[in-house]
């Protein structure tokens, strides 16, 4: 009995490969493959039947494996046969970007006197009760459907500076800076720097009266 998921680097699509004989709809008890909604995020757009959401058994999704007339698959590891022993259920469109859990990167400061942004309490994985944070920058990484979505995340700045207003007249003796990443559901997690790696962030403090010279006046 054989079934597996196969990634085609040419089409950037994932396919479910299965032995046709065990999924024949005329069988009394054909094999059925289920998964929950969280796992299906990685295989979205494969033909399926939705059965529920967060069901106790985890059977939220049933992969609709069947012969469609043009989806036979010849396994290169087995002797050729006709019709081929296997069928292929291929994604309708690539979803490799779903494999990247990162939604945004955030630079946060709790000590700088800036306006705080309200956030849902569940977004903080460490405390769970913080409902406002001083977010200096919040950007969405450029993630595509290709394999590079699993290799690196790049931040492309839209300008040389990100100007943020500060208020108050109390001297600043200490500056803190935290870098978080948020997932697709809004959860927030502190980024840990592995040994031998660095993370560089530059802050410039400029008088408001001089800031106009940093912005192109067109």
UniProtKB/Swiss-Prot annotation:
Q: Where in the cell is the protein located?
A: Virion
UniProt keywords, alphabetically: Virion
InterPro entries attached to this UniProt entry: V18/19-like_jelly_roll_sf
**Where primarily located?**
virion
Q: Which GO terms describe its cellular component?
A: virion component
What name does the UniProt record give this protein? Structural protein V19
**Source organism of this protein record:** Sputnik virophage
């Amino acid at each position: 009995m054989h079934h597996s998921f196969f990634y085609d680097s040419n089409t950037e699509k994932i396919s479910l490969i299965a032995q046709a004989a065990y999924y024949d709809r005329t069988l009394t008890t054909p094999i059925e493959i289920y998964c929950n909604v969280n796992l299906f995020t990685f295989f979205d757009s494969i033909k399926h039947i939705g059965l529920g959401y967060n069901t106790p058994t985890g059977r939220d999704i049933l992969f609709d494996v069947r012969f469609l007339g043009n989806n036979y698959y010849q396994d290169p590891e087995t002797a050729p046969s006709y019709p081929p022993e296997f069928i292929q259920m291929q994604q309708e469109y690539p979803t490799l970007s779903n494999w990247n859990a990162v939604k945004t990167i955030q630079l946060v400061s709790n000590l700088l006197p800036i306006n705080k942004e309200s956030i849902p309490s569940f977004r903080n994985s460490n405390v769970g009760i913080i409902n406002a944070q001083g977010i200096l920058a919040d950007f969405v990484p450029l993630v595509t459907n290709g394999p590079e979505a699993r290799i690196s995340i790049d931040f492309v700045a839209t300008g040389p500076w990100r100007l943020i207003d500060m208020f108050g007249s109390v001297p600043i003796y200490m500056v803190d800076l935290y870098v978080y990443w948020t997932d697709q559901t809004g959860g927030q997690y502190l980024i840990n720097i592995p040994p031998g790696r660095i993370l560089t962030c530059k802050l410039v403090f400029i008088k408001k009266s001089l800031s106009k010279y940093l912005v192109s006046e067109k």
